[in-house]
Amino acid sequence: MRRIAVMGAAGRMGKALIEAARQAPGAGLTAAIGRPDSTLVGVDAGELAGQGRIGVSLSGELATVLDRFDVLIDFTHPTVTLKNLDICRRAGKAMVIGTTGFSADERRMLDEAAREIPIVFAANFSVGVNLCLKLLDTAARVLGDEVDIEIVEAHHRHKVDAPSGTALRMGEVVASALGRDLQKVAVYGREGQTGARTRETIGFATVRAGDIVGDHTVLFAAEGERVEITHKASSRMTFAKGAVRAALWLEGRDPALYDMQDVLGLR
């Protein structure tokens, strides 16, 4: 059995991860960690997730449960994830990271840690989204420079980073297929007298509203026709199941920085 720990276990995504780890053959939830100051520390993690008692209590510190798991799944905040990354690197524990909003310097810290431990890091763990990334690469290569490309994403009102990590990853895939540098061609939102659109631009638009789990659409717009590749998530379990799948896949892997394209065999 692959022993799995969930960071941020008292949150919405954490609860979904607990459920997914409980359901997956070959996986077992053996540790759950929340904030040190949480009043829920000590509560059974299964009860937190609506799964009934499972005999795993919520801990307030990762360091106190290092002997209870093989791989940590972390969907939290960059500051928290980087602290956990250092602990796992020192302890030789594998990680699955779904946290978004890392700076370029913070991304380099992931690269450095992956020299010592195996890590799956992805902006989105949905199988459908990762299939879309493959389709986007193909669409960009076929349609080339004859279309205008726009990326529109929508999430719930509580999401703190924009554009989403998934939207940015989609932009990276498209830009790479076209030989463009996303940092140079990306336009984030438009307002006022912007002037005519240039062909090489890749535009991003963001919506934050209600309880939207995650919608992403990439438009390839030409004269007379438009191709749209869309993914809509209706449940966090989509991401949770993908993360647990990645945790199982990591068993026996060499230290390296992997993503869901590796897990799904799409490379």
Curated annotation (Swiss-Prot):
The keyword Metal-binding does not apply. Its main location: cytoplasm. NAD(+) binds at residues 8-13, 98-100, 122-125. The gene is dapB. One of its GO terms (cellular component) is cytosol. Gene3D superfamilies: Dihydrodipicolinate Reductase, domain 2, NAD(P)-binding Rossmann-like Domain. The lineage of its organism: Bacteria, Pseudomonadati, Pseudomonadota, Gammaproteobacteria, Pseudomonadales. This is 4-hydroxy-tetrahydrodipicolinate reductase. NADP(+) binds at residue 35.
